[in-house]
Curated annotation (Swiss-Prot):
Macro domain residues: 1-178
Organism for this UniProt entry: Sulfolobus acidocaldarius (strain ATCC 33909 / DSM 639 / JCM 8929 / NBRC 15157 / NCIMB 11770)
CDD domains assigned: Macro_Af1521_BAL-like
Gene3D superfamilies for this protein: Leucine Aminopeptidase, subunit E, domain 1 (3.40.220.10)
Name the UniProt record assigns to this protein: Uncharacterized protein Saci_1252
Pfam families assigned: Macro
Length: 181
């Protein structure tokens, strides 16, 4: 299941139900924790598919720079994934940190892709796993950020969600918000 949206800022947004580790994009965004310890969910899947080098580079990043603040990002190579980079976005925990931190994590992921002069990025439903964010809130925030963003090099955003329920909610929100350009 795939649906595409063309935004007024020139971005093409593709919503897909699938495995983010299998998509082809210049960068894959990982839903990470502040210590970049990739022990579950999307993070574990990315390390399993891309190789342990991703975890090693993440550990080195934290050793050198300290924990990544909520709402911020860090970058590693992508190992064996069909991408050049993994952008590790630290999303908030629902009900603990605010929606502004989720908005920041998504926006910083797009900005980092532009800083790296990338044309495509794959985004998961950040913070909807163990961090408990409802799909609808994540989808609304994501659509807002994508519509407001002013891309430099970025042309395509693949929003890759896992499961029929997530896909259905994201599609409903995107149909209502991204077609209104």
């Amino acid at each position: 299941m795939v649906v595409a949206y063309k935004l007024s800022n020139g971005l093409e947004v593709i919503l897909e139900n699938g495995d983010i580790t299998k998509v082809e994009a210049d960068a894959i965004v990982n839903a990470a924790n502040s210590y970049l310890s990739h022990g579950g969910g999307v993070a574990l899947a990315i390390v399993r598919s891309g190789g342990y080098i991703i975890q090693e580079e993440s550990d080195e990043y934290v050793r050198r720079n300290g924990p990544v603040p909520v709402g911020e990002v860090a970058v590693t190579t992508a190992g064996k994934l069909k991408a050049r980079y993994v952008i590790h976005a630290v999303g908030p925990r629902y009900g603990i940190e605010g929606d502004d931190k989720l908005e920041s994590a998504i926006r910083r992921s797009l900005e980092k892709a532009d800083e790296l002069k990338l044309s495509s990025i794959a985004l998961p439903a950040i913070s909807t796993g163990i961090y408990g964010y409802p799909y609808e809130i994540c989808a609304r925030i994501m659509s807002k950020v994508m519509k407001e963003y002013k891309p430099k090099f970025l042309k395509r955003i693949l929003v890759v969600v896992y499961g029929d329920q997530a896909y259905s909610v994201f599609k409903k929100v995107f149909d209502n918000s991204l077609y209104m350009n």
